[in-house]
């Protein structure tokens, strides 16, 4: 069996062991690769990043007209990324003096596909000007292609910053998020500093799909190549705290000698934290992914060791600014990624609080 990816054969609570690490970013442009290939896009992305950092400049009255915006998000999870994101989006729209009506539907990740489909079809029937959605599964992709091919609704894909190569001539209005590959590489570098070569570790994926591929497989590739770490097991979960708890227990039962567990999401990480505590395995290092409120609290308590923290509100602000540019007739970048900061349990409460204020500058007010 290939030691680069030793996969657990246990399957519990609906979790399927990962069959193999698929080629990272197969079928997608990597974020920096896309910007390097299309210099005009890099110029637009840099300009949008500057607008995100700047104070809002209200739209000229003659450019205003009522907008209908639909949002379908997987918001029902411990991670507060999605809820904060839409909050920052609305507050920036208000400060830009944009006239809008918004319809929100929050669903659970890896569930409620029927509810998502109904909500998405409703958004199209209502002739929304903009539809904000995500792209994680094959079913999402089929719906997105339907929107791109047959409607005038402008599609903003959230939580993805890697343009789909096949859509070269019909890309969505914008991809926006925090580059999963970059965040995973930053964590890989930090783990490489913490542990010697040939360290044993396990991976707890998100549910099967894009996020697991990018966050999980990017990390695996990086630490195996740079640090010669040895992967012992990898589990797909249901993207919930409970499935993270169960996967961590199963993994440690079969491979008790791991030095750390790499978790691909907040909910999965916090479930693993609970399992480690119950098993008395505080010697096993565990990361978070995203640095939302729940993760920062866990780091301050010493329950999580490390996370890569998104400057959360950047993406909500970026969507609002992009819509303003569109109303003004300006070109909008195809892709935008917000900033990350690595946070560890050795960081001072003062540094963590400063990062919290920066990341949540709209959604906390």
From Swiss-Prot:
It holds the Pfam family Peripla_BP_4. One of its GO terms (cellular component) is periplasmic space. Keywords: Periplasm, Signal. GO terms for molecular function: DNA-binding transcription factor activity; transcription cis-regulatory region binding. It is found in: Periplasm. It comes from the Bacteria. SUPFAM superfamilies: Periplasmic binding protein-like I. Residues 1-21 form the signal peptide. Belongs to the bacterial solute-binding protein 2 family. Binds to the signaling molecule autoinducer 2 (AI-2), a furanosyl borate diester, (3a-methyl-5,6-dihydrofuro-[2,3d][1,3,2]dioxaborole-2,2,6,6a-tetraol). This complex then interacts with the LuxQ sensor protein. This is Autoinducer 2-binding periplasmic protein LuxP. It comes from Vibrio parahaemolyticus serotype O3:K6 (strain RIMD 2210633). The lineage of its organism: Bacteria, Pseudomonadati, Pseudomonadota, Gammaproteobacteria, Vibrionales.
């Amino acid at each position: 069996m290939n030691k680069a990816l030793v996969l657990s054969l246990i399957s519990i609570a609906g979790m399927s062991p990962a069959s193999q690490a698929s080629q990272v970013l197969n079928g997608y442009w990597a974020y920096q690769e896309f910007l390097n290939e299309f210099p005009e896009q890099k110029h637009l992305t840099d300009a949008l990043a500057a607008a995100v950092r700047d104070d809002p400049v209200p739209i000229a009255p003659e450019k205003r007209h009522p907008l209908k915006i639909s949002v379908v998000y997987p918001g029902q999870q411990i991670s507060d990324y999605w809820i904060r994101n839409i909050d920052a989006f609305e507050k920036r729209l208000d400060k830009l003096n944009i006239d809008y009506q918004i319809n929100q539907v929050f669903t659970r990740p890896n569930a409620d596909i029927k509810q998502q489909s109904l909500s998405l079809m409703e958004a199209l029937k209502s002739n929304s000007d903009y539809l904000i959605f995500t792209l994680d599964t094959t079913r999402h992709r089929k719906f997105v292609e339907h929107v791109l091919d047959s409607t005038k609704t402008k599609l903003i894909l959230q939580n993805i910053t890697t343009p789909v190569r096949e859509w070269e001539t019909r890309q969505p209005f914008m991809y926006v998020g925090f580059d999963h590959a970059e965040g995973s590489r930053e964590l890989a570098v930090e783990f490489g500093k913490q542990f010697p070569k040939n360290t044993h570790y396990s991976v707890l994926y998100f549910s099967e799909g894009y996020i697991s591929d990018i966050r999980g497989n990017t990390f695996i590739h990086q630490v195996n190549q740079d640090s010669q770490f040895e992967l012992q097991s990898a589990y797909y979960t249901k993207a919930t705290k409970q499935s993270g708890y169960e996967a961590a227990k199963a993994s440690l039962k079969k491979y008790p000698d791991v030095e750390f567990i790499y978790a691909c999401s907040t909910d999965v990480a916090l479930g693993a934290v609970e399992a480690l505590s119950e098993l008395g395995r505080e010697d096993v290092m565990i990361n978070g992914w995203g640095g939302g409120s729940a993760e920062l609290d866990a780091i301050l308590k010493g329950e999580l060791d490390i996370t890569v923290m998104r400057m959360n509100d950047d993406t909500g602000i970026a969507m609002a600014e992009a819509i303003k540019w569109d109303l003004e007739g300006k070109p909008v970048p195809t892709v935008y990624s917000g900033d990350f900061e690595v946070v560890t349990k050795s960081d001072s409460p003062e540094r963590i609080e400063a990062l919290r204020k920066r990341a949540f500058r709209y959604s906390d007010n």
